[in-house]
């Protein structure tokens, strides 16, 4: 309901204006307090890169985090990732993921990143606690925080913001009147803006998601031969239509298209009963939640972010200069 108001012209949104004003006052005051030192955030001894957004919903942050980890690893860095672990309930916090960690414990994005990148990943409601654990481990020399642009209690050195190039900022209003967590003017203070699909704006870095060969959810086996005939598709992500459009662009004939909310806790009986016939395609993020009960004809589509070399050059330059990008000066966290 709200999402339809955010991304379409609707006079009904003005009914939410008082709540948006209240949100603006509270969030703006908090941001101002950290920026001017009235509230102190935790500053790590290691460089911290935040990958986030100013709007709610799926903008493509996780592929950017994976890309960043892989690029830094290839250049000799030892990155670690911290996350809030949304949707999970760990046995304790901070919680470092291991090979047996589940999405019920750590959330879906952290499990995906840990399995895909093989780097240390720690979750905690207070990201500073996760950062301290990584510092104490001595295993990392740079920290990437998955989401957390608005988590000003953790100081950062570089800020990357991912924008949905197709939907942009909707009606450009703050929550709940619109989809924005912070005003569009916040982008003036970040180090880089990444445009996921669509036409990038001035100064934005274009990003493209490149699909790989589908893999079986149950055991990661690559698809040996193209799937023929109709297939079903499910997506429990921030913007499911983007995934369905990707599948159609790859030539798949979709029968059922089932969209769930982001971080949806899948029920085995429901999915097995609903998708027991035709082959099923899902996102990698959904696959990490379904692996334990997946059927043999369930597949996920791995995607990787493709970004210009100039973005990496910019980041490496900032790190070489001590990791003090614009983001380090705009807020204590």
Curated annotation (Swiss-Prot):
Any single biological process term in GO: lipid A biosynthetic process
Pathway assigned to this chain's UniProt record: Glycolipid biosynthesis; lipid IV(A) biosynthesis; lipid IV(A) from (3R)-3-hydroxytetradecanoyl-[acyl-carrier-protein] and UDP-N-acetyl-alpha-D-glucosamine: step 6/6
Transmembrane regions listed in the UniProt entry: none
Reactions accelerated catalytically: a lipid A disaccharide + ATP = a lipid IVA + ADP + H(+)
GO molecular function, one term: tetraacyldisaccharide 4'-kinase activity
Keywords: ATP-binding, Kinase, Lipid A biosynthesis, Lipid biosynthesis, Lipid metabolism, Nucleotide-binding, Transferase
Any Gene Ontology CC annotation: plasma membrane
EC category: transferase
EC assignment: 2.7.1.130
Residue runs in coiled coils: none
Superkingdom of this protein's organism: Bacteria
Record-stated family: Belongs to the LpxK family.
Physiological role: Transfers the gamma-phosphate of ATP to the 4'-position of a tetraacyldisaccharide 1-phosphate intermediate (termed DS-1-P) to form tetraacyldisaccharide 1,4'-bis-phosphate (lipid IVA).
Protein name in the entry: Tetraacyldisaccharide 4'-kinase
């Amino acid at each position: 309901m709200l999402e339809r108001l955010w991304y379409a012209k609707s006079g009904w949104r003005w009914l939410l204006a008082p709540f948006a004003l209240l949100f603006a006052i509270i969030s703006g005051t908090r941001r101002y307090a950290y920026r001017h030192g009235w509230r102190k955030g935790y500053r790590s001894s290691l460089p911290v890169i935040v990958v986030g957004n100013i709007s709610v919903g799926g903008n493509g942050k996780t592929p950017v985090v994976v890309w960043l980890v892989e690029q830094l690893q290839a250049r000799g860095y030892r990155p670690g990732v911290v996350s809030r672990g949304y949707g999970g309930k760990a046995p304790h916090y901070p919680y470092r993921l291991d090979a047996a960690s589940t999405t019920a414990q750590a959330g879906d994005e952290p499990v995906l990143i840990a399995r895909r990148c093989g780097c240390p990943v720690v979750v905690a409601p207070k990201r500073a606690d996760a950062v301290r654990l990584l510092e104490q481990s001595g295993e990392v020399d740079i920290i990437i925080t998955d989401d957390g642009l608005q988590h000003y209690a953790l100081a950062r050195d570089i800020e990357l913001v991912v924008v949905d190039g197709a939907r942009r900022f909707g009606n450009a209003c703050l929550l709940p009147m619109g989809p924005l967590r912070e005003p569009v003017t916040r982008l003036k203070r970040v180090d880089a803006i990444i445009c996921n699909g669509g036409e990038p704006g001035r100064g934005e870095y274009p990003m493209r998601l490149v699909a790989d060969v589908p893999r079986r959810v149950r055991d990661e086996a690559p698809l040996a031969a193209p799937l023929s005939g109709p297939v079903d598709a499910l997506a429990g992500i921030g913007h499911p239509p983007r995934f369905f459009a990707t599948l159609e662009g790859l030539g798949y004939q979709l029968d059922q298209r089932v969209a769930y909310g982001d971080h949806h806790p899948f029920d085995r009986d429901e999915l097995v009963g609903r998708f027991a016939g035709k082959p099923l395609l899902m996102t990698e993020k959904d696959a990490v939640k379904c692996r334990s009960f997946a059927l043999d004809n369930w597949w996920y589509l791995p995607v990787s972010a493709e970004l210009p070399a100039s973005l990496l050059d910019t980041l490496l330059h900032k790190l070489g200069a001590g990791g003090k990008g614009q983001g380090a000066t705009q807020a204590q966290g």
